[in-house]
Amino acid sequence: MQQPPSQPQPGMGGPPPPPQGAAGQPPQWGAIPPPMPPHQYGAPPPQQPPAMWGQPPPQAHYGQVPPPQPYYAAPPPQAMPAPAAADEVKTLWIGDLQPWMDESYIYNCFAATGEVQSVKLIRDKQSGQLQGYGFVEFTSRAAADRILQTYNGQMMPNVEMVFRLNWASAGEKRDDTPDYTIFVGDLAADVTDYLLQETFRVHYPSVKGAKVVTDKMTMRSKGYGFVKFGDPTEQARAMTEMNGMLCSSRPMRIGPAANKKTTGVQERVPNAQGAQSENDPNNTTIFVGGLDPNVTEDVLKQVFAPYGEVVHVKIPVGKRCGFVQYVNRPSAEQALAVLQGTLIGGQNVRLSWGRSLSNKQPQHDSNQWGAGAGAGGYYGGYGQGYEAYGGYAQPQDPNMYGYGAYAGYPNYQQQQVAQQQPPQQ
């Protein structure tokens, strides 16, 4: 596949001219400003260019993104502005951030535009650790819209990742259009989100993004991912046309995936057993909830068999749930990711990790098949894309790149869960 030409990245262009009327010594660049009290949120960060601005970033492997046209604005007033109306929202949500990406890095990403007012990244209240998402406020709604259209889906500076941006409010600008998602397996270890996205985008213009699922501990690829489309016709074409085509050094295996829901999700937190089962590398059991009472164990096995060798299937008598155990963990992970929200019989099922059968209770125990884990182990609530778009346990924008907010991008590494809705047809 022909790679796009290498060009500069957004936010890494030449230094902008200093703002007119600036006085005094330039602020020290690179230091994160001290936390501001809530009533000062929105105060502008320094408008001066960084001292090391001219340093070129490392060359990315799969092509770069042309820089946006710079827009410079006079420093905004220091007084707290009046609350913006719905049509004046000028804050963007940014997600799928790595743990080392702090306010300084995010500010530098957009500094060349001259339009950044403030950056706020969300941290865990107890540990203080960054949660992988935050908010960037710009000088105007028009500026925020330009940045959203220019940067979203493009490469971030100095890292093989793409920007995940969306409006921070529930305004009319939010992308609520349906997504049509496919599963992509057998990916080479060097395939990134950007490479997977561009592999499809050159053939299908409606591609909205792609996500390679990674191990949350090692951050290494699990060998599969998802691509989402805005056009169901292109999604259907890609299912056949791209199956067996090369991505990097290996042919891809394409399969169906449940699609983004257009309705909200009810988030729940998994119980301790559910979290333990999810993180157990030896657990190969999947809980299947919301099961049609007419579905038999043989039917359930037929549905799950394409993703690996199934060693056991159980549907407890009188229960609308079941359990599927695989020989190995990767098979279970792929099945959980691909079949989440799938229509089996007359019902859309919800999947989660069941209790490891190696630790199951005696026969008379009602939890022997992992019902305790299934009760709180539903996946979703990307709460990311993400899910996430995977690996961050934080609430995310469910309408932007919500890998976990809809079954096509299940952020099953997270500790957040959701009641699944039927997929878009």
Curated annotation (Swiss-Prot):
Bias kind Pro residues: ranges:
1-20, 32-80
The subcellular localization recorded is: Nucleus; Cytoplasm
Respond yes or no to whether keyword Cytoplasm is given for this record. Answer: yes
Q: Where is the RRM domain?
A: 90-170, 180-259, 284-356
The processes (GO biological process) annotated in the record are:
mRNA transport
Keyword Transmembrane helix belongs to the record: no
> What is the protein's quaternary organization?
Interacts with RBP-P. Interacts with RAB5A.
Q: What is this protein called?
A: RNA-binding protein L
